[in-house]
Amino acid sequence: MPRLLRLSLLWLGLLLVRFSRELSDISSARKLCGRYLVKEIEKLCGHANWSQFRFEEETPFSRLIAQASEKVEAYSPYQFESPQTASPARGRGTNPVSTSWEEAVNSWEMQSLPEYKDKKGYSPLGKTREFSSSHNINVYIHENAKFQKKRRNKIKTLSNLFWGHHPQRKRRGYSEKCCLTGCTKEELSIACLPYIDFKRLKEKRSSLVTKIY
């Protein structure tokens, strides 16, 4: 019995030592510069590709443009060529591809109108993907705009919490502060907050894209 008690006390002591080390790690500031700073933030946030994350954060509408162009291309512009387009009159110089492209875009806009849907029960190109309505795209754009506004407000609030009332530190910047004076784990974890919001936006975006298709 005394032996078991000694072992349990020893195990408890080791656990307390480990816990105190972790606490000191969190509260102690470490000087991190350049790629070492990026690696530490990556380890904290668990995100592997930061260059891709920055690109998607800065251009949230790029996917929307790509999806819109895919939907127009799905209609194959050559299927909308009219007899006038196929054999243009002399001297006009009409480009059959550009004219067909305009007809494809006009057809896409018409199919998103409720009046057109009432008149036409089915699409002549049943095998192609159905187009999203303008309402769904407006919801998608509204979600992105709301995310950008929320992100700007959060960064402004976190900047005040992080730097306090030190304009010189604010000018110095996050990475320079971590390099010159050091950052604690709590301060480094601030960089994870935009990524958490970005993950939530991606979940909303995937649900919206599912509705569109």
From Swiss-Prot:
Testis specific. InterPro entries: Insulin-like, Insulin-like_pep_6, Insulin-like_sf, Insulin_CS, Repro_Hormone_Insulin-like. GO terms for cellular component: extracellular region. Disulfide bonds join 33-179, 45-192, 178-183. Belongs to the insulin family. Keywords: Cleavage on pair of basic residues, Disulfide bond, Hormone, Secreted, Signal. Residues 55-168, 201-213 form a propeptide. The lineage of its organism: Eukaryota, Metazoa, Chordata, Craniata, Vertebrata. One of its GO terms (molecular function) is hormone activity. This is Insulin-like peptide INSL6. The keyword Secreted applies. Residues 1-20 form the signal peptide. May have a role in sperm development and fertilization. It is found in: Secreted. The gene is INSL6.
